[in-house]
């Protein structure tokens, strides 16, 4: 966990990096050059596997933000205004949400520096992360709360604006669990009795596991991903693995979009490939729902849509799914033409998932 002095130092480093970026633009102007900012091309074709770190990162192809056109000049103008805002925010020890940044731009005196929509401001913050090698959390920027939670035998200390507080993520929380903060690096893990971490996609399945006492019976920390996981959720999952040496397994629906949820936990996402080493847990394993489970348990299903089929075919070429296991499962799913939700396991009874399915799969994987 970061102490107050460590936090001050991190803020100073982040602010210095931002000022260096602004100085680079100024120097280019002073030398009579057209100002530019170079960033990696954020496409699937520019993702490569870093064998040393076991995560997917951006390759060598880059895109250049240049002031040699009106559109390019406006992008750099917006970058300068955003850098100034973030540097001032750090100096004042304040924070803001990504949504607030979008609206705050409407008060800037230069109309051409204002954002057209929040996607534009979000992308600019990501660009600044990449070129400065500082995370948005260090800029004191945060998303809207994701609502993702933890439930399990974990005792931690959290740093808040009101001081420190110590929490047991079973005994000191309600059925909803402990809500993951925007910056999990403010958490210190004090003690735990956990044997592994189970990341669960849907709220319904997470609630079923908690109601059935799965976390207590098997000494598991249940992380609710809440769909596509927020960065904070992926970061705390990585910390649970790295800091506590706990195995991580991911439990999702059986469809192509859920496989991508797993991939973002394990290997990172295209959007945040520059942070894969910080967010991804390459040792994480996929427990299900597998296409093979759909066949074996004769689960209730829905037919694959055209977009599902296209997504599965795309995943056959996705570098994150390039192994025999995923090729076999994806080809099987294309062959049967079906998908299933986690909660389809309830067709065999409300206790089937905790008494049979998960224990058997975890046993096969060597976790239990």
Curated annotation (Swiss-Prot):
Keywords carried by this UniProt record: ATP-binding, DNA-binding, Isomerase, Magnesium, Metal-binding, Nucleotide-binding, Topoisomerase
Entry keyword annotation includes Nucleotide-binding: yes
Active-site residue list: 103 (o-(5'-phospho-dna)-tyrosine intermediate)
Pfam families the record matches: TOP6A-Spo11_Toprim, Topo_VI_alpha, TP6A_N
One GO MF term attached to the UniProt entry: DNA topoisomerase type II (double strand cut, ATP-hydrolyzing) activity
Any one annotated GO CC term: chromosome
Chain positions recorded as Mg(2+) binding sites: 201, 253
Cofactor(s) the protein needs: Mg(2+)
Alphabetical GO biological process terms: DNA topological change
Reaction catalysis annotation: ATP-dependent breakage, passage and rejoining of double-stranded DNA
Enzyme Commission number(s) from the entry: 5.6.2.2
Domain called Topo IIA-type catalytic: residue spans: 9-148
Function: Relaxes both positive and negative superturns and exhibits a strong decatenase activity.
Stated family: Belongs to the TOP6A family.
Oligomer and partners: Homodimer. Heterotetramer of two Top6A and two Top6B chains.
Name used for this protein in its record: Type 2 DNA topoisomerase 6 subunit A
Taxonomy of the source species: Archaea, Methanobacteriati, Methanobacteriota, Stenosarchaea group, Halobacteria
Gene name of the encoded protein: top6A
């Amino acid at each position: 966990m970061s102490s107050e002095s460590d936090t001050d130092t991190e803020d100073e480093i982040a602010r210095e990096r931002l000022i260096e970026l602004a100085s680079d633009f100024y120097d280019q102007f002073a030398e009579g050059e057209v100002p530019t900012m170079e960033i990696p091309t954020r496409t699937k074709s520019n993702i490569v596997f870093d064998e040393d770190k076991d995560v997917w990162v951006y390759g060598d192809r880059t895109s250049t933000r240049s002031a040699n056109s009106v559109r390019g000049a406006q992008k750099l103008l917006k970058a300068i205004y955003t850098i100034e805002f973030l540097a001032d925010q750090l100096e004042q020890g304040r924070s803001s949400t990504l949504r607030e940044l979008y609206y705050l731009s409407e008060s800037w005196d230069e109309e051409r520096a204002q954002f057209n929509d929040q996607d534009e401001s979000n992308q600019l913050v990501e660009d600044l992360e990449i070129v400065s090698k500082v995370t948005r959390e260090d800029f004191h920027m945060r998303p809207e709360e994701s609502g993702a939670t933890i439930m399990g035998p974990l005792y931690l200390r959290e740093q808040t604006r009101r001081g420190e507080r110590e929490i047991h993520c079973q005994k000191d929380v309600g059925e909803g669990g402990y809500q993951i903060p925007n910056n999990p690096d403010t958490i210190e893990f004090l003690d735990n009795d956990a044997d592994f971490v189970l990341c669960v996609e849907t709220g319904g399945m997470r609630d079923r596991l908690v109601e059935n006492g799965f976390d207590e019976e098997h000494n598991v920390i249940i992380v609710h991903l809440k769909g596509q996981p927020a960065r904070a959720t992926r970061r705390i999952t990585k910390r649970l693995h790295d800091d506590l040496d706990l195995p991580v397994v991911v439990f999702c629906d059986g469809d192509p979009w859920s496989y991508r949820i797993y991939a973002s936990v394990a290997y990172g996402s295209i959007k945040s490939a520059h942070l894969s080493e910080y967010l991804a847990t390459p040792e994480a394993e996929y427990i299900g729902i597998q296409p093979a489970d759909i066949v074996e348990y004769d689960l209730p299903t829905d037919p694959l849509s055209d977009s599902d089929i296209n997504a599965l075919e795309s995943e056959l070429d996705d570098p994150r799914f390039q192994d025999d296991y995923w090729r076999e499962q994806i080809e099987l799913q294309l062959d049967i033409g079906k998908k299933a939700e986690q909660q389809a396991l309830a067709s065999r009874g409300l206790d089937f998932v905790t008494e049979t399915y998960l224990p058997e799969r975890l046993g096969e994987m060597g976790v239990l």
